[in-house]
């Protein structure tokens, strides 16, 4: 999964969710699908965290210049 892209993994995760919600899988197949989904969810979460750390916000100063600051959200602790 290392060379996999975020979008590909997200699509696979969505497919797993559809299969599980469909209710037609056996218990064993449901467990396998769940395990696959957990791997894709973890991969996507990691990629999103990496992307968030790369994003910087430009803050305009009073003199018209800009400074970079890390991107933060309201729910950061």
Swiss-Prot record:
One GO term (biological process): DNA catabolic process
Annotated GO MF terms: exodeoxyribonuclease VII activity
Gene3D superfamilies: Exonuclease VII, small subunit
Primary residence: cytoplasm
Subcellular location: Cytoplasm
Matching InterPro entries: Exonuc_VII_S, Exonuc_VII_ssu_sf
Protein family membership: Belongs to the XseB family.
Subunit and interaction comment: Heterooligomer composed of large and small subunits.
Descriptive protein name: Exodeoxyribonuclease 7 small subunit
Source organism of the structure: Trichlorobacter lovleyi (strain ATCC BAA-1151 / DSM 17278 / SZ)
Upper lineage: Bacteria, Pseudomonadati, Thermodesulfobacteriota, Desulfuromonadia, Geobacterales
